[in-house]
Structures are given as C-alpha cells and as structure tokens.
Amino acid sequence: MSETTDTSTAPVSTDTPESSEATQTADRNRNRSTTPGSEHFKEFISTEWAERDEPLPAPREQAAFAAARRAKVSAAFPGLRLVIPAGEMKQRANDTEYPYRAHSAFAHLTGWGSDSEPGAVLVLEPSGDGHDATVYFRERAGRDSDEFYANPAIGEFWIGPRPSLAHVAADLAVATRDIRDFDAVVDRIDTATLVLREADPELTERVDNARVRFAAEKALSENAQDTPFSIEFNAEHEPDDDLARVVSELRLVKDAFEIAELQAAVDSTARGFGEVLAELPRITSEVRGERVIEGVFATRARLEGNDVGYGSIAAAGPHATILHWTRNDGPVVPGDLVLLDAGVERDTYYTADITRTFPVNGTFSDVQRKVYEAVLEAADAAFAIVKPGIVFREVHAEAMKVIAKKTAEWGFLPVTAEESLEPENQYHRRYMVHGTSHHLGLDVHDCAQARRELYMDGTVEAGMVFTIEPGLYFQPDDLTVPEEFRGIGVRIEDDILVTADGAVNLSAAIPRTVDAVEAWVRGAQG
C-alpha cells in the first residue's frame, strides 16, 4: 500500500466535519511524510493537464423511484426540514478505513449506491406544500489545488476520479451543492428540523447544537414569535426517531426497481454458490477450507456487485450448529455438511440472503438426510401460506409446527409437539432459537426501525420481500439427542417475493431438495 502523505497543506474548511479527521490524519503522518513542498514542484504538478471531456449523463434508472420515495417522506413531515446524512468513512486502523458504504436510508432516497461520496448529506427543505431536495457533497478540487495530490482521503491522485456537482445532479436528477454550503443550512436550523441520527454522529451533534442554540436565542428574545412548526425535543430525541421510523417503514413494500435488483442479487448469489461447489477439491485440501469458500464467494460478489451483503457464513461440520459462524477458519471434511449462508450485494446496495446446506462428498448420510428433509418440510410449509393478508408472524409459526413435530417424533422433547408449541413451553426451540423470516432489501435485515405492529405483527402485502429460513442445529455436546445427530446443523433459506395472489421464491433455481442438492454437488465437480 502506498505511503500516505502529509495532508496539512490540503485546503479543508475548519467548519466542516471532514476538517477534524483530515487534521488528525495529517498529524499522524507528519513523522513519515516526504511530500514535496517546493514552489517548483507545486507549479509543475498543477499545470499541463488535459481538459476533462465529461458529458453529463442521463438520469440513472432509480432516480425516478428515489424521487417518489422522497415525496412520501415529504408528505409525512410537512413544514419540517429533514437532514439525511450518508455518513463518513469508518476507521479500521490508524490511517486505513473500511470500504465505504453510505447509510441505507440515504441510498434509498437518492438512488446513490456504491459510487456515493463519503460525507454527503441529503436535505429536504420545506417549500410550499412539499420539500425541495438537495444533495450536499464535497466538490472535487482542481488540479491546481494541493488537495489533488496531497490529500490521500479525497485527492484524485490518490483515490481516482471523483464526480462533479453537475455530474451528480444530472445522474440523480436532484439539485447538488458543495458541502461547504451546508454551513448555511446549519445556520438556518431551528427546532423544526429533524436529522437521521444514526447515520453520522458528528453531523448529528452539529444539528443538535444548532437546535439548542436556536431554542436558547428564541427564549432570550423579547420580540421572538413562535415558529409555526416548532417542536419540542426531549432527551430521547423522539421527533428524530419518527424520521428513522418513517424512512424504515417506507422500505417494507418494494417498488419495481427494488424487486428487479433483489432478483439480480439472488442470481449472482446462485452463481457464487455454484463456483464454491466447483472448488470443493481445493477447499477440502486446505487446512482452512472454510476460508476458501468465503474467498471464492467474495470474488463473485465483487465481480458482479459491490461486495457481500454481510459476513459470509461458511460453516463446515459442527460449525454449522453455530448460527453466525463467520470466523470461517476450519477445515472442510468429506462426509460432513457445509452450511453456506451468503449474499451478493449489488452496486445499488440491494442484497440477497441465501442459505444452502450440502454434503461435501455429494451424498447425504441417512441421519443428515433425515434432518435436511425435516428442515425442507418446514420451509415449504411456511412458504405455502404466504399471500397478502396473512400476518407476518404466521410464517414463523407455520415452520415451527413442523420443527416441533419432527423433534417430538424423534423423541427429543419431554412433551408432545402440541404441548411444546404452547407459549409457556417452546421446548423445540432448543434446536432452532432464531426466527424464520426477516425483511430483505438494502439491509440484509431490512426495515429495522419499523414498528412491531407493521413488522412482526403486520399484515403481509404484495411487494414485500422477506426470507424463509428454518433450521435445525444439534450442538456437538447436546445430550438431549442421540450421538449420531450431534454436530449436524442444517438451514435452508430462500428470498420470497409476495405477489398479488401468493408468493414467488426468487431463489427457487438454487437446488433445494435432497436429490437436487446431491446432483448439484456432483455435477459441479465436472
């Protein structure tokens, strides 16, 4: 990795959130900087660059959908200024950062995904009966600026071409302004302003301080008049929480663009799974075969999308009984099962979330088959009831009927299946402690701030996309099950689209039945 340079000469406004980070980076790097500082160098590097030929793009496909989403948010908050940050880079160690990902609400309301600019902010400013939308981000510096070559965080010599304000305005079909102009927004902030708090803590603090300042000045002013849309803020920031709730609930029902992106993410994930199977000979030859699985799938995710949508679970043998095994440092042994839970995230940030469990040697043992078919029966039972009008939690309840029935039939429960299903018992949940379904979209666990009455207790609607993912997990040291069951973990997870009269399994093309999975594994070997 190239040595970072001293950013102390970069022209960073002292009023912007970037300034403190840039200054800290500069301070850390001064002890090893070799950045040329001579006037001859500065003159030489700032001249003789070709003119950029950058025709403005047509609006991207999702721009119209993003505008419609903004209109819905606007209608929910008449007269209030709304601040939705994209968020800043997150430090990994010293002067290295994690790959940037904008906040999902920002992406949803702008259509800006993996090519978005760190530190950008969407502001919906009250105007008439609605709002005017503006995206603020840092305009790129000219080649005659120190920023171009001396700022490793944003200089184009370091990170590559950055978009102009005009380019982004045309691309997203929304007004844009330089982030320095956001200072004027902060100066106008009053208590009729809401901010999406979790997206950018430093920016949120600026908004909080501005609201407090406005309230104090208003209280001290003898001639102050009430602001028509003034609202009280308590320590829990409830009005801001309302904004987080609305933008989260807006994503419960997907539009046509989102559904197409989710299907594309599923299709890419299917290809990634197939490539993992093709590499099984190499995977089984490595001490950390699970890491090879993770790497093979990640390659497909980077080729066809932005990244993996979450930490891939490549769990072989007894690791499959650990629900979120992301360490992925174990061997992959013929005769064992592999539980692969992974999803490709598109450049738009929409992600798949698929799990398949397969035998390393291409053949399920008798007990592996028994467990697998029980989980498949639970998944199919849950899918069979999905249609508009049911309550979301019924999907889980249907799967649990099968899990309780099977574990009771095998003699693992101290009561009958019916008794175990009673809320005060739930013995069968020892072998499946997680839920069966969650909403899917820009986040793998989408709509996280939605109210329970609209999520778990909500009515299923056409356009919703969620997972169905029952499983059975028998820990290696679980004395309630026979020895031959111990160390077996099986999960089958599909991504489900609710239609007008039923549902479609978006991942149905990825083999699910015992015979199909065995043929899939064997066929991938050539």
Show the residue positions of the predicted features:
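Active-site neighborhoods and metal-handling regions in enzymes and metal-associated proteins
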Residues: 1-526
